[in-house]
Amino acid sequence: MQQKENLVEEMGVHFERLFNLPPLAARIYILLLLSDRSGLSFDEVRDFMDASKSSISANINLLLQGERINFLTKPGDRKLYFKPSPRFLNIRLEESLGLLKKETEIVNQIMTFNTENNINGFEEVQTKLEKYAEHLQEVQEKYIKSLDYFHENN
């Protein structure tokens, strides 16, 4: 159990930054990723997190709205069970691809502006920016291939 707690904490910090999630939401997300795929009940999540019902509820709702988790019910049981969305990797790749596209757009705007306005000293960084733009394009193509794979095998 201690190993799971350590992983939830360590990965939670990473997911806070990566997905821009509140600390508790990031840790709930990690807990669900590290748990049985049949899902965890609200009470199981609350017990592990040792947080208030309202905090757990608010953060679970945030994860549900972001399509990072799903809920299910079990026959004869009135409880909701939460588990990671089967699309969680797709969502991550889509978000990353969006950021890469935006960065490519910004780099291209910088190069265009500096070229059109003959910015003094720009020639020194032009080659590096062009190489960086190529790199961004290559990474985008890899993300697109991965997304295609996940869409076909989801």
Regions flagged by a language model, labelled:
Residues 33-38:
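Short helix-capping/hinge SLiMs at alpha-helix to coil transitions
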Residues 52-53:
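Short coil turns linking two alpha-helices in DNA-binding domains
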Residues 1-27, 153:
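Short alpha-helical segments that sit at the start of domains
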Residues 44-47:
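A short acidic, leucine-rich amphipathic alpha-helix
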